[in-house]
Amino acid sequence: MADKKIRIGINGFGRIGRLVARVVLQRDDVELVAVNDPFITTEYMTYMFKYDSVHGQWKHHELKVKDDKTLLFGEKPVTVFGIRNPEDIPWGEAGADFVVESTGVFTDKDKAAAHLKGGAKKVVISAPSKDAPMFVVGVNEHEYKSDLDIVSNASCTTNCLAPLAKVINDRFGIVEGLMTTVHSITATQKTVDGPSMKDWRGGRAASFNIIPSSTGAAKAVGKVLPSLNGKLTGMSFRVPTVDVSVVDLTVRLEKAATYDEIKKAIKEESEGKMKGILGYTEDDVVSTDFVGDNRSSIFDAKAGIALSDKFVKLVSWYDNEWGYSSRVVDLIVHMSKA
């Protein structure tokens, strides 16, 4: 007998919300039962889901609006809410056990806990959180305990960096390191120069500029891999591409290793324990080659360099939208088995 599907609700139908929905609808072990977004109508929700400038048109089910409160994916009904206050969303009635909190607004434990009042059993925040435990699938998800009701799936960049850093640290030891992510545009940026009081550079036109920015992704690796706490930090350059980003991790190693030995170690892990999370390529790839890649981190063997046998620069690609959304669902599946 087939196991009961894991029932998922999504709060916030932005880039990650919509792509998590796409991932869920293409899998057999999970089921989308409800979506909440107070800022869009059901009809507009259908349009936003169906057409995607990066990932293309949805071709798996016919999509219809049954009524204001119901979408049909093929024959499958999905309940739609338009409720502003998370505690008022009746997840329980809709049958949602897990809620993906992808508004970007309710990222701390207290705010995300509001979903539990409406009947959700667990909440996964699709962003870093200052106080919810963070999990990176392939790195520390085994530390999840079933009494944790609110967790964070960390950031897309932490999901790219952590598997790579784990392999390097396990095999060779990391003394210290700096990360740079060359990162595609995201929704918080501006199409033309505009006001951005908290981040002045971030208010400059996204499609015209390389914009230096801060990121907590490298420090967050220290939360999911405590042995690296205080050893990594990093920054970001926002560049005018719409999806796919790349991490440059420059580290000092404890144990001397040739670049070939490092490549071999990463390749082994990518075919072993980390298969499906960490990838490995020796092809002459560029960013668009990774659109739709569901792995968290794809090591580019040809792009990295070594200065000496203890000082190396490693390069790893990630589809910051699709890879990350895939991990959100993987984390939920893992939690449901705990």
UniProtKB/Swiss-Prot annotation:
It is found in: Cytoplasm; Nucleus. Pathway: Carbohydrate degradation; glycolysis; pyruvate from D-glyceraldehyde 3-phosphate: step 1/5. SMART domains: Gp_dh_N (SM00846). One of its GO terms (molecular function) is NADP binding. It catalyses: D-glyceraldehyde 3-phosphate + phosphate + NAD(+) = (2R)-3-phospho-glyceroyl phosphate + NADH + H(+). One of its GO terms (biological process) is response to cadmium ion. The active site is at 156 (nucleophile). Key enzyme in glycolysis that catalyzes the first step of the pathway by converting D-glyceraldehyde 3-phosphate (G3P) into 3-phospho-D-glyceroyl phosphate. Essential for the maintenance of cellular ATP levels and carbohydrate metabolism. Binds DNA in vitro. Together with DNA polymerase II subunit B3-1 (DPB3-1) and GAPC1, enhances heat tolerance and promotes the expression of heat-inducible genes. This is Glyceraldehyde-3-phosphate dehydrogenase GAPC2, cytosolic. It comes from Arabidopsis thaliana. The lineage of its organism: Eukaryota, Viridiplantae, Streptophyta, Embryophyta, Tracheophyta.
